[in-house]
């Protein structure tokens, strides 16, 4: 499980990216790279990391569910994810 401060930091970055998204796009279209550079670092979407919404784990995260592989398997076996079941052939 990730530290809470890491998860909180990533959530804060998500909010900053949303806040500056339109302004960043306008500046890119205008080609005003000087003004782009003056925006906060965390306003860049490349600074975001996909993390598990339950544990905060950064690796092995499925974008579609927002869960890491461990939690995804656990929830699938418990039947908490509709339409997902263990494969057998």
Swiss-Prot record:
| This protein's GO CC annotations | cytoplasm; small ribosomal subunit
| Keyword match Ribonucleoprotein | yes
GO terms under biological process: translation
Spell out the Gene3D superfamilies in the cross-references. Answer: 30s Ribosomal Protein S14, Chain N
* Protein name according to UniProt: Small ribosomal subunit protein uS14
Assembly, in brief, is: Part of the 30S ribosomal subunit. Contacts proteins S3 and S10.
Where does this protein have coiled-coil stretches? none
- Which UniProt keywords are present, listed alphabetically? Ribonucleoprotein, Ribosomal protein, RNA-binding, rRNA-binding
PANTHER family documented for this protein: 30S RIBOSOMAL PROTEIN S14, SMALL RIBOSOMAL SUBUNIT PROTEIN US14M
RNA-binding among keywords: yes
Family annotation (InterPro entries): Ribosomal_uS14, Ribosomal_uS14_bac/plastid, Ribosomal_uS14_CS, Ribosomal_uS14_sf
Q: Which organism is it from?
A: Chloroherpeton thalassium (strain ATCC 35110 / GB-78)
Family per UniProt? Answer: Belongs to the universal ribosomal protein uS14 family.
Output the SUPFAM superfamilies linked to this UniProt entry.
Glucocorticoid receptor-like (DNA-binding domain)
Alphabetized NCBIfam families for the sequence: PRK08881.1
Molecular functions (GO terms): rRNA binding; structural constituent of ribosome
Instruction: Cite the Pfam families for this sequence.
Output: Ribosomal_S14
Q: What does this protein do?
A: Binds 16S rRNA, required for the assembly of 30S particles and may also be responsible for determining the conformation of the 16S rRNA at the A site.
What gene is behind this protein?
Answer: rpsN
